[in-house]
């Protein structure tokens, strides 16, 4: 009976002392533990269920691992598609009228006078 009374407090206190028996869940890519309060040297990274904090050791750099790895490019030289995509589109539009065209228009326009040819530049 004395052995049972001695074993009962040990079984009750064991989950409080040893985290593996306490059922603390892993968080932050399995580098942290869900706790009510973080210990010294730990930082809160996110919140767990039941209003607990995800405590991660702050002396190490714990970053989330990417879910996918970047696809390596087989050819690093730019191709024709890259050149097409990087071209800035600028369009210059010129209206040029010659004296010959002006004379023909003036003769067809019943002798009206016209000014010298105008050159318009728009971009």
UniProtKB/Swiss-Prot annotation:
InterPro entries: Beta-defensin, Beta_defensin_dom
GO molecular function ontology, one term from the record: membrane destabilizing activity
Signal peptide: 1-19
Any one Pfam family match given in the protein's UniProt record, by short name: Defensin_beta_2
Main location per the UniProt record: secreted
Polar residues compositional bias, start-end: 109-123
Domain of life assignment: Eukaryota
Disulfide bonds: 27-54, 34-48, 38-55
Keywords assigned by UniProt, alphabetized: Antibiotic, Antimicrobial, Cleavage on pair of basic residues, Defensin, Disulfide bond, Secreted, Signal
Keyword Disulfide bond in annotation: yes
Cellular compartment(s): Secreted
Pro-peptide region(s): 65-123
Tissues with expression: High-level and epididymis-specific expression. Most abundant in the epithelium of the caput and is also present in the lumen and bound to sperm.
GO CC terms, sorted: extracellular region
GO BP of this protein: antimicrobial humoral immune response mediated by antimicrobial peptide; cell-matrix adhesion; defense response to bacterium; defense response to Gram-negative bacterium; defense response to Gram-positive bacterium; innate immune response; killing of cells of another organism; negative regulation of cell adhesion
UniProt-annotated stretches for the region Disordered: 100-123
Family listed: Belongs to the beta-defensin family.
Function: Host defense peptide that exhibits antimicrobial activity against both Gram-negative bacteria, such as E.coli and S.typhimurium, and Gram-positive bacteria, such as S.aureus and B.subtilis. Inhibits cell adhesion of E.coli on intestinal epithelial enterocytes. Causes rapid permeabilization of both the outer and inner membrane of E.coli, leading to morphological alterations on the bacterial surface. Binds to bacterial lipopolysaccharides (LPS) with high affinity, and may thereby be involved in immunoregulation through LPS neutralization.
Listed name of the protein: Defensin beta 118
